[in-house]
Amino acid sequence: MQKIRRDDEIIVIAGKDKGKRGKVLKVLADDRLVIGGVNLVKRHTKPNPMAGVQGGIVEKEAPLHASNVAIFNGETNKADRVGFKVEDGKKIRVFKSTQKAVDA
């Protein structure tokens, strides 16, 4: 079970985008995350009339390593860590500071 999953609200704790918040769009296999509106890079694309792509300079999100982000706890309005707890025979994710379920 992963500590950070798709659609989690996160905050960047290190790097050029430190302090920015966003939602996880994609979780990649090598402990990297694509976060909406964070770590934007410019990519030069060729026009492709067959696919309807105009071409030019496009801004898109680049992956960040999971060690540079922390899950955002809406209750405390701070970055938090994730722990695990077994309730009713199921393993759930909980915030370390409040011990409340992340997915609640």
Curated annotation (Swiss-Prot):
| MF terms (GO), sorted A to Z | rRNA binding; structural constituent of ribosome
Would the keyword rRNA-binding be found if you checked this record's keyword annotation?
yes
Q: Name one Pfam family in it.
A: KOW
Q: Name one GO cellular component term.
A: ribosome
Q: Which Gene3D superfamilies match?
A: 2.30.30.30
Which CDD domains is this protein grouped with? KOW_RPL26
Keywords per UniProt? Ribonucleoprotein, Ribosomal protein, RNA-binding, rRNA-binding
Q: One GO BP annotation here?
A: translation
Q: Tell me if Iron-sulfur is a UniProt keyword of this record.
A: no
Q: How does it assemble?
A: Part of the 50S ribosomal subunit.
Please give the function described in this protein's UniProt entry. Answer: One of two assembly initiator proteins, it binds directly to the 5'-end of the 23S rRNA, where it nucleates assembly of the 50S subunit.
Q: Which family does it belong to?
A: Belongs to the universal ribosomal protein uL24 family.
Please state what the protein is called. Large ribosomal subunit protein uL24
Q: Which gene encodes it?
A: rplX
